[in-house]
Amino acid sequence: QGGGVSILPNPDNYGNIGFFMAGRSMRQIGYANDLISKLMEFEIKDWEFKNAKEIILDQLESIEEDDISSQLFVHDALINKTQKWTTKENIEATKKITYEDVQRIYQEFTNSIFLDIYAYGNYDPSEVVNFAKSARNIIGDTSQKIHWRDIPDFSVKTGTARMKKVSISKDGVGLLDNYVYPVKSEEISIQLNLINRLMRPTFFNELRTLQEVGYIASSFDSETNEYPTLSMLIVSDNTNLKDLKEKVMGFIYSFVVAFDQLPDSTVENTKKALLDEMNKIPENLGIEASQYFADWGEGNYSFDTKQKAKEYLENTTKQDLTNLINDFFIQGNYMNTTV
């Protein structure tokens, strides 16, 4: 940071490690070359290995002390296969790792580096090309000839459910209830985002403020392994899990009925607010660059996801949302995952 550049580890969602550099463009390539050189010359010391192992174990063993909502997301990642191993499995594996194991893995890693560079800013294209060549020379040959992405073996089966009940040391109960659409679709994801913006204030007011079901009551849209997903989160110290699930289901069906009476103008105003967010001029180059990170990580080198999202949103009508809500919750065209 002293040179005007922040360097941060930046792992992606597919099992790859990267480094994110933000700051003065003219200094970044020099720092990147130095970083790569140090990575390739890195010597793992036994005492550093022992300290790192202890820190990792402390972090893993403290997960059970996290708040209920945090632990819900840990277990949610397991049933949705975005996380491969349980905390217990990670702890057991970490305990077994030896100094020799880490040295071997380091050698395997450095011999299989696939280099992928995303540069956004005041760069001459030839400068980036020359950096790629110099970085490849520093790293040397690689056994990895394509960009590796770890894609979970996950499919959505309509009408099915995955449920996991976990006992923890914290007082109270929590529920994370996900409704996963069976088709990968950017358009559906955008429509779910719009539906959630219309639903979330009512969900909070009804379950948190009026019924006082829980001290946390929120809904959000996301993607589960690229499948559009609508989720409800409740944490309570005065309600049991069965009642929480019933409250969520009751709210959903009341929302479906109420949505028909929602004025078209409310949908259009919400659309406009979301479009205004998308069209907002980024505050700085870092924010501007970050909007394309997901495309880069997924190998979409057209970098057009944001533009497509705006087009989908502009073309969405209230009837489209009504059709999706009915398909989701009346026809039951979803898979339910619950922790």
Please name every model-derived segment.
Residues 101-104, 316-329:
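A short, acidic, amphipathic alpha-helical segment used as a generic capping/interface helix at domain edges
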Residues 1-41, 50-96, 112-121, 172-193, ...:
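M16 family metallopeptidases and their MPP-like homologs
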Residues 137-140, 199-203, 249-254:
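C-terminal, active-site-flanking charged/polar segments
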Residues 101-103, 158-164, 215-221, 322:
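Glycine-rich, charged/polar anion/phosphate-binding loops
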Residues 77, 99-135:
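Non-catalytic, conformational "gating/processing" segments within enzyme and secreted inhibitor domains
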Residues 141-202:
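His/Glu-based metal-binding/catalytic segments typifying zinc-dependent metallopeptidases
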Residues 131-145:
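Glycine-centered hinge/linker elements that transmit conformational signals in sensory
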